């Protein structure tokens, strides 16, 4: 797992969900651990798409439940 991507994702998640950066770990679940609702999740996906200049299809977004899932998806898209 790329440390650079992980740190950037954690920063975006912290900002989007208004949680302390220290609370965001690679295994943090957006809804269960960080209190995101469905709208938060949509906004988070949009922020990740913009930050990494990628497109996350709805089907893929549904499978991204944790910070680590997001990092893995971004790494695969960025090659």
UniProtKB/Swiss-Prot annotation:
Pathway of action: Lipid metabolism; fatty acid biosynthesis
* Localization per Swiss-Prot or TrEMBL: Cytoplasm
Q: Which Gene3D superfamilies match?
A: ACP-like (1.10.1200.10)
Listed GO biological process terms: lipid A biosynthetic process
Entry-linked Pfam families: PP-binding (PF00550)
Question: Which UniProt keywords are present, listed alphabetically?
Answer: Cytoplasm, Fatty acid biosynthesis, Fatty acid metabolism, Lipid biosynthesis, Lipid metabolism, Phosphopantetheine, Phosphoprotein
Question: Which parts of the sequence carry O-(pantetheine 4'-phosphoryl)serine?
Answer: 38
Job description of the protein: Carrier of the growing fatty acid chain in fatty acid biosynthesis.
Family, according to the entry, reads as follows: Belongs to the acyl carrier protein (ACP) family.
Please report the name of this protein according to its UniProt entry.
Acyl carrier protein
**Taxonomic classification:** Bacteria, Bacillati, Cyanobacteriota, Cyanophyceae, Synechococcales
Q: Which gene encodes it?
A: acpP
């Amino acid at each position: 797992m790329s440390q650079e991507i992980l740190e950037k994702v954690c920063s975006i998640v912290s900002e989007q969900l208004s949680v302390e950066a220290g609370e965001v770990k690679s295994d943090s679940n957006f809804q269960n651990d960080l209190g995101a609702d469905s709208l938060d999740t949509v906004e988070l996906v949009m922020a990740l798409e913009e930050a990494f200049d990628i497109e996350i299809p709805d089907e893929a977004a549904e499978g991204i439940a944790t910070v680590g899932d997001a990092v893995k998806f971004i790494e695969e898209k960025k090659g």
